[in-house]
Amino acid sequence: MTRKIGLTLPQRGTFFDVLSLSELVETGHWADETGLFDSLWIGDSLLAKPRPESIALFGSLAAVTNDVTLAVGCMASFPVRDPILFAEQWATLDQLSAGRMLLAVCTGIVKPKDASAREGAPYGVSDASRAARMAENTDIVRRLWTEEDVTYAGRYTSFENVTVLPRPVQSPPPVYIASNPVPEPLATRALRRVATLADGWMTTRKSPEHLTVNLPAIKEFLVEEGRDPDTFPVSAYHNLNLAPDREAAYEESYRFLGEYYGPVFSREATRHWTATGTPEQVAADIEQLYADGATEVTLRITSWDWRRQLDLLVKEVIPRLRPS
């Protein structure tokens, strides 16, 4: 598969002086105009990790872009959202973007654990039910995007004779599952779920061997499902910080992620999840993700000097990843 490069916009950075919301949308337009990025990503959460709401933000991004895929990684609120309303919202976005939407769903269970419980409580959604709700909602939205007069009797949602219009341009839009390392026996269950339910896998490298250990398992499950593992997309979500002093770049990234998510990532995990240093060092780290099996790497800059680093990414890193 042709390697792809995505740009993740720092949505929560609008809360701590990285950029304004209008600047974020303008950056999406700029990224599309460069022709260097295959996709543009934003995150999602309602109450657990507040940020500008993703569905509304996608409406603006669809209006100012023409070519890039518009993707969410991940739609953490998916298990608590009404699947009928969501199916209609996403179909409308696919119409607005002329068929450029990509949905990456996840359970939305985050650290500290009480954060996701706090988000689920107003909707009556427990953390224990999130994986099953994610799977059920995925089934529902796919049917609503491709069928008419849908009747559904699920564990959490039931309805009769529902038709969602307008139809999405894509039939249906792709749905990835985003998942990260978890202890057994949950790990095997999560990886099998990717192979049985998803059109692709999104993940983050929290240890050096994450992709090389987990991707072969997914490929085995894909073969069991009669699916071709060689055409299955794997999107690696990665951070970067460009600076001559690699340790200084790492320290800023650690502080940035602490502001972004709270004190939930160890220094070791941050180091594995972030490419730091000179353009040569950053490009080499990203190359390793492709070598480990990623078909796309989507990059987020973890620096308050975001605009200058974005310029460096375009001028000095991407040319090393896509030599002419």
Residue ranges with predicted function:
Residues 1-69, 128, 172-174:
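N-terminal beta1-alpha1-beta2 module of alpha/beta enzyme domains
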Residues 2-19, 79-151, 209-216, 304:
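Flexible, glycine-rich active-site loops centered on histidine and acidic residues
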Residues 3-9, 38-42, 70-73, 101-105, ...:
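Hydrophobic faces of well-ordered beta-strands that scaffold small-molecule active sites
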Residues 7-22, 74-83, 172-188, 268-280:
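Active-site mouth loops of central-metabolism enzymes
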Residues 29-34, 58-67, 90-101, 192-196, ...:
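Acidic (Asp/Glu)-rich catalytic clusters
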Residues 39-64, 76-77, 205-209, 300-312:
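Glycine-rich, proline-tolerant flexible connector loops at the mouths of alpha/beta enzymes
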Residues 52-72, 133-137, 314-324:
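Alpha-helix-loop-beta-strand connector modules within alpha/beta enzyme cores
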Residues 61, 93, 141, 175, ...:
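Conserved, mostly hydrophobic/aromatic
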